[in-house]
Amino acid sequence: MSIPLLKYSLSTQNQRVDGYEVSPGEEQPRAYNTDNLPSAVEMDEVIWAAYRQIFSEHQILSSTSDSNLESQLRFNQIRIKDFIRGLILSESFRKLNYDVNNNYRFVEICVQRILGRDVYNEREKLAWSVVIASKGLESFVNMLLDSDEYEENFGDSIVPYQRRRIIAQRSKGEMPFNLKTPRYGADFKEKFGMPQFIWQGPVRQFRPQEQRPKAGDPALFLGMVNDLALFK
């Protein structure tokens, strides 16, 4: 018997507020779609937008491209929604995101990249994590793509995007998801031996040559003491 999706409360987010802009400015995201039979160049832009949304720019590699899916989309054999589904369920996406994160963080990444919003709370992370554990990765992805929320905002022919990241009432927009949620979480960075202090210290302590202490300066003695303390 499968466990049903646990209930979770919603929280205040920009994407839950209707927009009444008469003519949205250039800061609003462009919605890439295949409704109007795009040309070859326009289709290239649509495909690039899909890769950028799902893999994020720092994960777009030659190994993540899927020429078979691209060909099916170009010849109208599948819709954007199916193309997104294929990218998320690909072996490349699994290796780059699922295998290097726990279920909670993977849920956060998928909600951001598929639904175009941040998770509402920890309860939502838990609810979707239970789905992954009980029904598997494919069922989790299908539930997101087949949800009413996805259908209302993107349908079958629009590439997902971060919804209402910038609103006119605020001087600054929300942080883009690719910066807010990098590939690795803090726990996996420690596991892989990549603590940030290894490289941040020398960068922050850099001094131009003319500002470096001369022989006999007390600062040199203090630096020597600090170096010795690190090896205790």
Curated annotation (Swiss-Prot):
Gene Ontology CC terms: chloroplast thylakoid membrane; phycobilisome
GO BP, sorted A to Z: photosynthesis
Thylakoid found in the keyword field: yes
Signal peptide (from-to): none
Coiled-coil blocks: none
Membrane topology designation: Peripheral membrane protein
Cited InterPro entries: PBS_linker_dom (IPR001297), PBS_linker_sf (IPR038255), Phycobilisome (IPR016470)
Main location per the UniProt record: plastid
Occurrences of domain PBS-linker (ranges): 11-191
UniProt KW keywords: Antenna complex, Chloroplast, Membrane, Photosynthesis, Phycobilisome, Plastid, Thylakoid
Keyword Ion transport: no
The protein's assembly and partners: The phycobilisome is a hemidiscoidal structure that is composed of two distinct substructures: a core complex and a number of rods radiating from the core.
Annotated family: Belongs to the phycobilisome linker protein family.
PANTHER family, A to Z: PHYCOBILISOME 32.1 KDA LINKER POLYPEPTIDE, PHYCOCYANIN-ASSOCIATED, ROD 2-RELATED
Protein task: Rod-core linker protein required for attachment of phycocyanin to allophycocyanin in cores of phycobilisomes.
Protein's name according to its UniProt entry: Phycobilisome rod-core linker polypeptide cpcG
